[in-house]
Curated annotation (Swiss-Prot):
This is D-inositol 3-phosphate glycosyltransferase 1. Pfam families: Glyco_trans_4_4 (PF13579), Glycos_transf_1 (PF00534). Mg(2+) binds at Y308, R309, A311, T335. Homodimer. SUPFAM superfamilies: UDP-Glycosyltransferase/glycogen phosphorylase.
Length: 418
């Protein structure tokens, strides 16, 4: 596992403790991180770089190795009980995970850890093997705590300490956006020369425009409806309640809209909402809009692309977001986005061109923005064109090229070299 100094990487050890890359994104802890790990690995393999993805064996009788595609394997590491566990319990199995990873055969050039839990493992493995550690955080506890102070879903002190240790140990840090890079430096004291910004991508072959009426027919949606779509994990941080309350205000202000409006939520409960998976449906009933709301489980990407095409608007009202992959996927399908003006969404959405960014988290403000778009079909048409143009700049090939440059920098320069 000794790095080939002065050359591009030939083999990468990728670590994903939090969630398996084989899991269906959109529920539990599976989300954009899963998509990122899988899509970058596939494209690394296309360039001739082999990728081994190490993840926890979270179910009984899993095969030790699963081939994801030619050049990419997923290695299941026994660590803790062979079942899904609350992520709050995962720090207790990191020692077992680290030991299992160190026993695995392989000569790797670089370790790339995703999420702070993986980083705790990655720091030990990289140091033991004499190879550089590249770290992607995907979320930051201090940022989350600023918007969810003291609430369920906020980051505990042990997580903040763990994040700080990982950030200090990493040879290179990959930020999804300039905003995340600034947060790493300002909040965690990361050395600026070790922070590299690499925007995630989307599969532009899969997420592309299609016939809206056909998509709606496949999904059982009225062809003439005004469809608002929330896609992703259903948790407070993602703000599904904001969209639900905004929709209720729209309907109560215009009863005629009840015949046209469909509010769809595609995703599974995550975080604090896993204890009450029906909470979203209950909220719709309490607000008197149960007939207009449709709640669907997470679905494979081809079906998700149909949901994006079927939607009039995709709404991403996150209270915090390091990037917002859903927003770019939707725009790649030609659907404008109404999103919170937070974090990476300010990069994922081009305000006034591909969608609308909303300041604050007041449902009334979202209702106002959506109502204005309902009343202005010409603007919606312009935003559709802008969405396609903006999303075209987020293919995976550029992201992978930039990641490979980060790896080369880490291999050749070592710690502290830009």
């Amino acid at each position: 596992m000794t790095a080939r100094r002065g050359s591009a990487p030939h083999r990468i050890a990728t670590i994903s403790v939090l969630t398996s890359p084989l899991a269906q994104p959109g529920g539990g802890d599976a989300g954009g991180l899963n998509v990122y790990v899988v899509e970058t690995a596939r494209r690394f393999a296309e360039t001739g770089v082999q990728v081994d993805i190490f993840t926890r064996a979270a179910a009984p009788r899993l095969p030790p190795i699963v081939e994801l595609c030619d050049g990419v394997v997923v290695r299941h590491v026994p660590a803790g009980p062979p079942r899904e566990v609350d992520k709050g319990a995962l720090p207790r199995v990191l020692g077992e995970f680290t030991a299992g990873m160190l026993r695995a055969p392989g000569d790797y050039d670089v370790v790339h850890a995703h999420h702070w839990l993986s980083g705790r493992v990655g720091a030990l493995v990289a140091r033991s093997r004499g190879v550089p550690l590249v770290q992607s955080m995907h979320s930051l506890g201090l940022v989350k705590n600023a918007v969810l102070p003291g609430e369920d879903g906020s980051a505990p002190p042990a997580q903040i300490a763990g994040e700080s240790a990982v950030i200090a140990a990493a040879d290179r840090l990959v930020a999804n956006t300039a905003q995340e890079a600034d947060q790493l430096i300002a909040l965690y004291g990361a050395a600026p020369e070790r922070v590299h910004t690499v925007h995630p991508g989307v599969d532009l072959e899969l997420f592309r425009p299609g016939d809206r009426d056909q998509a709606r027919a496949r999904l059982g949606l009225p062809h003439d409806a005004f469809v608002l779509l929330f896609a992703g994990r259903v948790q407070r941080l993602k703000g599904p309640d904001i969209l639900m309350r905004a929709a209720a205000q729209l309907l109560h202000a215009d009863l005629d809209l009840a015949q046209r409006l469909v509010v769809a939520f595609v995703g599974g409960p995550s975080g604090e909402l896993q204890a009450d998976p029906d909470q979203l449906t209950k909220l719709a009933t309490d607000l008197g809009i149960g007939e207009q709301v449709r709640v669907e489980p997470p679905c494979p990407h081809p079906e998700l692309a149909d949901w994006y095409r079927a939607a009039t608007l995709v709404v991403v009202p996150s209270r915090a977001e390091t990037f917002g992959l859903v927003a770019v996927e939707a725009q790649a399908c030609g659907t404008p986005v109404v999103a919170a003006a937070v974090g990476g969404l300010q990069t994922a959405v081009r305000a006034g061109v591909s969608g609308v960014l909303v300041e604050g988290h007041d449902p009334a403000r979202y209702a106002e923005v959506i109502r204005a778009l309902i009343d202005d079909p010409a603007r919606l048409t312009a935003l559709r064109a802008g969405a396609l143009q903006h999303a075209a700049g987020f293919g995976w090939s550029e992201a992978v090229d930039r990641l490979l440059a980060v790896y080369r920098s880490a291999i050749e320069g070592g710690r502290g070299r830009p």
